[in-house]
Amino acid sequence: EAHTCGHDFHAAMLLTAAKILKENESMLSGRVRFMFQPAEETFEGAKDMLAHGVLEGVDAALAYHVGSGRMPVGLFMYNSGGTMMYSVDGFRITIHGRGAHGAYPHSSIDPINIGVHVYLALESLIAREADPGKACVLTIGNFSAGSAPNIIPDTAVLQGTLRTNDSASREKLVRRLKEVALKTAEVFGGMAQVEMISEVPPLVCDPAMTDEMVSYMEELPIPGLTPVPDTSASASEDFATIAERVPSVFMYLSAGYMDERGDAPAHNPKVQFNEDVCPIGSACLAHCAVRWLEEHQ
């Protein structure tokens, strides 16, 4: 399996920024910590690093993520006034019923039937209980049960994600997701267990610091370096747990192509990221670190 999200680019850019800053250490008005965040794809890496003290003595944080698509290298996307990326609450719902032969469904408690009703009820959460003025996305990406066509199994499993762009919607919908799954299973005589696999808040950047970082990047004489404000994505990023604790900025750097090489999205096996973004990202990271320390001695 491959994550195909550009994390090799992130590591290369940060390593190069570290090399630049180490070679020019006398220019630094403070200390810089380099965070190589693991397990972003499972939303566990930042939490583990926090538990091991990654923010001890840290006053601010800056993170970049490359983006694919039909767009030129040099765009940098940010949000200084709202949610940059949505929350994500991954969940696993295990439905327990009673298996039976397919010829005698009346002697079973069919977990597949229960699962179908749970699925439909959860979809109704977004349609009828989510504030239409807020952005909420619920996806069931896995529904598995049984191994034979003529046997009703004992269990069924649904796995998915709930994403929102504000904390109030998140709190309400996570609570209702659990209630709907448990009560729907009870209605049909079964039982449900709900496990929350990932719990990541919305990523909200510090407005003043974001404006600062944009101004520092605009100081660099890099051809095509272009700001794209008010960016918001329904994807999620556990850097949000860092941003909850210290003033933070998260930006997307375009690593796309303006031809067919930009057609495949991230997480697609055919995605291509443009390596021309690497020196841009390294230069911006290093310069922003130097300038922020100068201004905040």
Describe each PLM feature range.
Residues 113-297:
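Metal-dependent amide/peptide-bond hydrolase catalytic core
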Residues 16, 44-47, 106, 172-175, ...:
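Generic recognition of short, well-ordered alpha-helical segments
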Residues 12, 43-44, 179, 211:
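A generic alpha-helix surface/boundary motif
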Residues 11-18:
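DPxDG-like acidic metal-binding loop motif
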Residues 1-2, 8-9, 21, 26-153, ...:
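Histidine/acidic-residue-rich, glycine-tolerant segments that coordinate divalent metal ions
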Residues 13, 27, 35, 49, ...:
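Detector for methionine-enriched segments
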Residues 19-22, 33, 163, 170:
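Basic side chains
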